[in-house]
Amino acid sequence: MKVILLEELEGRGSFGDIITVKDGFANNYLIPRKLALPATEGNIKHIQSILSQKARKLEKIRTQAQELAKKLDGAEITIKKPVGQNGKLFGAITTSDIAKALNEKGFNVDKKQIIISSPIKNLGLYTIKVRLHNDIYASIKVNVEEQK
């Protein structure tokens, strides 16, 4: 029996794939658990429309991420923090601080998108990567200065 998968089945396929399985497996397991639908013409058209909607939505998100990457690439933000006697910061600059500074400049960036290996604890200029989509990154410069 041919069925259309509604969820990923390990070793069998992913959403929208049409696979052939034994009738008993389809009727007693896949279809009752809403893991698959019978591969009728109507069901195939329905799943294809869902897949095309998902593809359009993903393309729109990707385009928005590319536009943001163009605007964000090379942007410079300045963060001022109090400094101790030895030139080290009190506390550290974290992804939250960087995201807040970017949002104040009008860039809609979440702290989870900012990639730093460890919190910044010294004054200076740092280049930070921002992951906007699966494979779309932007580089920004973060200038850490002494708060007076």
UniProtKB/Swiss-Prot annotation:
PROSITE patterns, sorted: RIBOSOMAL_L9 (PS00651)
Instruction: State a GO cellular component annotated for this protein.
Output: ribonucleoprotein complex
Superkingdom classification of source:
Bacteria
Looking up InterPro entries in the UniProt record yields:
Ribosomal_bL9, Ribosomal_bL9/RNase_H1_N, Ribosomal_bL9_bac/chp, Ribosomal_bL9_C, Ribosomal_bL9_C_sf, Ribosomal_bL9_N, Ribosomal_bL9_N_sf
Which is one GO molecular function term here? structural constituent of ribosome
Q: Which GO terms describe its biological process?
A: translation
Q: Output the Pfam families linked to this UniProt entry.
A: Ribosomal_L9_C, Ribosomal_L9_N
- What keywords sit in the KW lines? Ribonucleoprotein, Ribosomal protein, RNA-binding, rRNA-binding
* HAMAP family from the UniProt entry: Ribosomal_bL9 (MF_00503)
Q: What does this protein do?
A: Binds to the 23S rRNA.
| Similarity comment text for this entry | Belongs to the bacterial ribosomal protein bL9 family.
Recorded protein name is Large ribosomal subunit protein bL9
